[in-house]
Amino acid sequence: KRPIKGTIFFIFFISFISVFYSFLNIGFWGLFTLGTVPKLDDSRVLLAQGIISILLVVFAIMLYIINILDAYRNAERFNRNEEIKDPKARMVATWDKTFPYLLISPGTFLLIFVVVFPLIFMFGVAFTNYNLYNAPPRHTLEWVGLDNFKTLFTIGVWRKTFFSVITWTLVWTLVATTLQIALGLFLAIIVNHPVVKGKKFIRTVLILPWAVPSFVTILIFVALFNDEFGAINNDILQPLLGVAPAWLSDPFWAKVALIGIQVWLGFPFVFALFTGVLQSISSDWYEAADMDGASSWQKFRNITFPHVIYATAPLLIMQYAGNFNNFNLIYLFNKGGPPVSGQNAGSTDILISWVYNLTFEFNNFNMGAVVSLIIGFIVAIVAFIQFRRTSTFKDEGGL
């Protein structure tokens, strides 16, 4: 018997009910109905309150389950005639076990309300009719089930736009990220070669693009790529080749420019990352390879590349995930343009920039939430699969 623990949990239960009863009652009512009286009931507030109510109840249930499991373990010890600690010893043992969780609890609660809560709220919005024409509090929202998902995949303009945007998003992610990784690796190997002099100076110069804030670099490139007065056309391409591509207004050339800018922005980080790994590879590997008569390509394929990928695979995967959601470059360069006839997204819009336009330009919150869920699902699945396939995580026991 543990009367002190029972008393504490009883007080906690009574306090929880007395403090949160009204909040939970309104929260669960609002979660199911989303309000009944326009202008009086704000469906957004009711949805948020309902989600918080669920989180509070889940927290209380978890504490109750922990209490039950602890009581079960104590009963097992009692049935085995094991020594039962006195209350003071139990309190010390409990403190020792729970102290690490106590330290991380503020961060955990912050994570729940900064990350988990918005995700659940977005998930809820995806199943409502929240758009410009019935936005609360003037109107109350309604649950529409999977209608928004059906709209995305069955109605012509939405389906065409979605597949066009996701195709470009995948091309953009794979091409831009792979090129920046390849360039970073190539430069790191060249600079790390023993015959190259002035390595510190060269490395400093190559890392400089990373030191400049990316939005400043993007705005500079916007001016350089301007169709009418940009230096790239007027001072380089037109005098030398007699051509002046429409970098901002032609879909193909806009995509080429975006990929080029991202390679410029992204390769310094990869270069610095690979440089550190290359310097950590023991020279004994290369000396042994030289004794065996290995060529430069064989040393790269069998020594350099495996070492680099093993050490940096998780970070490289995050590079792909980051570019998949690279909103800043797409929006600052030309806001996803130029426009495409018959679609509600620009020719260079990726999924994340399309979500921004749907939400803040067209106030189509429900469809923006649907696309956001698809983005999260794609990134999570791909990242999880790739992480599990990397040697780094396999050696740590996997996921």
At which residue positions do the language-model features occur?
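Transmembrane helix recognition focused on a "late"/terminal membrane span
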Residues: I4-A93
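Membrane-interface helix starts
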Residues: R2-I11, T98, I166, L174
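Short helix-adjacent coil turns
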Residues: K1-R2, N363
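A structural signal for multi-pass alpha-helical bundles of membrane permease subunits
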Residues: F23-W29, P100-L399
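Transmembrane alpha-helical segments of polytopic membrane transport and secretion proteins
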Residues: I65-L103, K197-K199, F387-L399
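Juxtamembrane loop-transmembrane helix junctions in multi-pass integral membrane proteins
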Residues: L40-L47, I51, M91-T98, P194-K197, ...
